[in-house]
């Protein structure tokens, strides 16, 4: 039995939850935190986290 195979199909890739990198304010450890996850350092348990800055250039035009 020879079945034809389809090559034009598209695969559905569900969007991954956004993962952000944060720095702990107490110990300085890097933590990856996903959406709906508790904001707490995995090393020391501190709850104050700083979001990492972007690497790309951010420029604003003043008027």
Swiss-Prot record:
Q: Which residues form a coiled coil?
A: none
Keyword annotations for this protein?
DNA-directed RNA polymerase, Metal-binding, Nucleus, Transcription, Zinc, Zinc-finger
Note the zinc finger regions (C4-type) by start and end residue: 24-44
Q: Where in the cell is it found?
A: Nucleus
Q: InterPro entries annotated for this entry?
A: RNAP_P/RPABC4, RPABC4, RPABC4/Spt4
**Which Pfam families would you find in this protein's record?**
Zn_ribbon_RPAB4 (PF03604)
* Example GO biological process: transcription by RNA polymerase III
Family annotation (SUPFAM superfamilies): RNA polymerase subunits
Source domain of life is Eukaryota
Q: Where is Zn(2+) annotated to bind?
A: 24, 27, 41, 44
What GO MF terms are annotated? DNA binding; DNA-directed RNA polymerase activity; zinc ion binding
A GO CC term assigned to this protein in UniProt: RNA polymerase II, core complex
Q: What does this protein do?
A: DNA-dependent RNA polymerase catalyzes the transcription of DNA into RNA using the four ribonucleoside triphosphates as substrates. Common component of RNA polymerases I, II and III which synthesize ribosomal RNA precursors, mRNA precursors and many functional non-coding RNAs, and a small RNAs, such as 5S rRNA and tRNAs, respectively.
What does the subunit section of this Swiss-Prot or TrEMBL entry state?
Component of the RNA polymerase I (Pol I), RNA polymerase II (Pol II) and RNA polymerase III (Pol III) complexes consisting of 14, 12 and 17 subunits, respectively.
Question: What protein family is recorded?
Answer: Belongs to the archaeal Rpo12/eukaryotic RPC10 RNA polymerase subunit family.
**What is the name attached to this protein's record?**
DNA-directed RNA polymerases I, II, and III subunit RPABC4
- Give the species: Schizosaccharomyces pombe (strain 972 / ATCC 24843) (Fission yeast)
Q: What is the lineage of its organism?
A: Eukaryota, Fungi, Dikarya, Ascomycota, Taphrinomycotina
